[in-house]
Amino acid sequence: MALRTIDALDLAGKRVFIRVDFNVPLDPQGKVTDDARIRAALPTIRHAIQAKAKVILASHLGRPKGKPDDRTKLTLEPAAVRLSELLSQDVILADDCVGDGVKKLVRDLKDGHVLLLENLRFHPEEEKNDEAFARELASLADVWVNDAFGTAHRAHASTAGMAKFVKEKAAGFLVQKEVEYLGKALGSPARPFVAIVGGAKVSDKIKVLENLIAKADAVCVGGAMAYTFLKAQGVPVGRSLVEEDKLELARQILERAEARKVDLLLPVDHVCGAEPKETAERVVVNDRAIPDGLMGLDIGPKTLDRYRQRIAGAKTVFWNGPMGLFEQKPWSEGTFGVAKAMAASPAVTVVGGGDSAAAVEQAGLVDKMKHVSTGGGASLEFIEGRELPGVKACEE
């Protein structure tokens, strides 16, 4: 099934409901501290404005729990202010996302003007994909557009449920870009295709690893999950984090990679500390084995060099998961080293959301990558080969 996109629709004079992802971080004063998600939605919003649509935007923010101060702490007002600055035009903020007041605002909305509905999750029915709530949202729209890739793996009322009750539906440009880049990286990559996989737990990445082993030419493993693989090979790992109940699974993954003739690379040296703290002494262990009393907290310099060489020789590079405890400076070189190597590569470089995207952002290298996914859980599920409800709803 092909993805129908917003540019295939006539939007003039229509009520165009765009599900965006404005789940942005706020400081204690309620100011947006990182507007990347708002900026990511701009091409779709601008297209609808220029097409003279009545633009209705909807998003969630945080996880409201029905507390009295949720309405002030988790309001979308800061997002409305920032969006207004980015668009250089007024953005009307509704005080709810359903109800008579909202219907009146939609009725009075002029072509080319923008209305942002209040936080969808102030209504528990949103996450329950409640049919009556989905119908109520749908009553505001002639056209439904999903541009929130970050929530595309959730079957919520606004991300999937309401699509059944709106005649015209499409993906926004952000969802289209995500599906194209992630789909191409995994479906028909230019080869050699090198995958870099990190993170703390093998259990979080089982399906991702299995899918990548079926498609990649080489998989470079870092992060704490590497110690489970090393222990599965009989290598001492000191006090490193190990999932004891996943050792057999790690062996099976190693065997599968060997059977498929995929190079599965594990660290050959480590940056260690006595504990995972910024103040711990940084010890470079020039060996696969980690001594007792130390724990691996980052890949070592030799390992980083090996991974750099693989990246340099690749035509497609996909990265998901940090190489170490990169939030703390002593253990950040592996992660930022991978980011820099990818930035310097002419290959198609795709970063699969979550912590890797945060690291690329922190390193100021977003513009040097072909694509940095905005979806953490959504990009993981896409890589696992699962169907995303928010994407399926946009198919013709």
UniProtKB/Swiss-Prot annotation:
Question: Which residues does ATP bind?
Answer: K205, G296, E327, G353, G354, D355, S356
Gene Ontology CC entries for this record:
cytosol
The pathway that the record names for this protein is:
Carbohydrate degradation; glycolysis; pyruvate from D-glyceraldehyde 3-phosphate: step 2/5
According to UniProt, the reaction catalysed is: (2R)-3-phosphoglycerate + ATP = (2R)-3-phospho-glyceroyl phosphate + ADP
Q: Which GO terms fall under molecular function for this chain's record?
A: ADP binding; ATP binding; phosphoglycerate kinase activity
Per the record, the domain of life is Bacteria
Keywords, A to Z, come to:
ATP-binding, Cytoplasm, Glycolysis, Kinase, Nucleotide-binding, Transferase
One GO biological process term is: gluconeogenesis
Q: Which Pfam families match?
A: PGK
The residues that the entry says bind substrate are D21, F22, N23, R37, H60, L61, G62, R63, R121, R154
Give the EC number(s) listed in the UniProt record. Answer: 2.7.2.3
**In which broad location class does this protein mainly occur, judging by the first location in its UniProt entry?**
cytoplasm
InterPro entries from the entry? Phosphoglycerate_kinase, Phosphoglycerate_kinase_CS, Phosphoglycerate_kinase_N, Phosphoglycerate_kinase_sf
Task: Output the SUPFAM superfamilies linked to this UniProt entry.
Answer: Phosphoglycerate kinase (SSF53748)
Q: Which PROSITE patterns match?
A: PGLYCERATE_KINASE (PS00111)
Q: Does the keyword rRNA-binding apply?
A: no
Q: Which family does it belong to?
A: Belongs to the phosphoglycerate kinase family.
On assembly, the entry states: Monomer.
What is the protein name for this chain? Phosphoglycerate kinase
Print the organism lineage. Answer: Bacteria, Pseudomonadati, Myxococcota, Myxococcia, Myxococcales
Q: Which gene encodes it?
A: pgk
